[in-house]
Regions:
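Conserved donor-binding/catalytic core segment of Leloir-type glycosyltransferases
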Residues: 182-200
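A short, active-site helix/loop in glycosyltransferases that binds the activated sugar's phosphate group
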Residues: 130, 134, 138-175
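Short, conserved loop/helix-junction motifs that constitute active-site signature segments
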Residues: 100-107, 133-142, 193
């Protein structure tokens, strides 16, 4: 059974990220993976600074996840052929996972979902575009596949990040539009029986 390390985005109840936290491990297991969830340590359970996530908390959460990943490599607990699935590719340090695998002479697959970033001018992190435009391309280069929720995100990333840096030919095939994953178990069917309506 292949090993999959699930590196979740913070599971906030008011966001779909809580659904992902519950449902992705089960989905990966049913696909035949041995799943290990690498939880982070949040500072907040609500958004105080930022919009989609609390920026202070998300940086802390992801840095504690990265520390655990480094420890797993150090302890030789990452089997060759492992998969790392990141619930948020906007993960400062994701390129370190590629380096850890290379330096430990392990073949791993790094993949995940990119919600938004400085490349989406409507995003709170658009303020980081002067420097994050380079790290975003680095994140994609470190990954084998990056999923995005819409054609808008696919084209925005290509047009605002890859093409200006001359990286489109090499990296665009790593971007894949999937839509935002939803799980049927979160949306129970409501019985809406058909009835004759009498209009008076």
């Amino acid at each position: 059974m292949p090993q999959l390390f699930y590196v979740p985005i913070e599971p906030l109840v008011e966001r779909y990220t809580e659904s992902w936290y519950r449902n992705f491990p089960t989905t990966f297991r049913s696909a035949g993976f041995d799943v290990t969830v690498i939880d982070g340590v949040p500072l907040e359970d609500e958004v105080k600074v930022g919009t989609f996530l609390d920026v202070n908390s998300t940086v802390h959460y992801k840095s504690t996840q990265l520390a655990q990943i480094a420890a797993l490599f150090n302890q030789r607990r990452v089997p060759n052929g492992s998969v790392f699935f990141f619930g948020d590719v906007e993960f400062w340090g994701i390129e370190s996972v590629r380096l850890l695998a290379q330096m430990n002479r392990l073949d791993v697959t790094i993949t995940g979902f990119l919600h938004a970033g400085s490349y989406t001018i409507e995003d709170a992190f658009a303020v980081a575009a002067p420097y994050q435009q380079y790290t975003e391309v680095g994140w994609l280069a470190a990954c084998d596949r990056v999923y995005v929720g819409s054609d808008y995100h696919y084209h925005a990333f290509r047009e605002r990040r890859l093409i200006p840096l001359g990286a489109d030919d090499n990296l665009r095939s790593r971007l894949m539009v999937t839509g935002n994953p939803l799980f049927k178990s979160d949306y129970p069917l409501v019985d809406v029986s058909k009835r004759n309506k009498v209009v008076l």
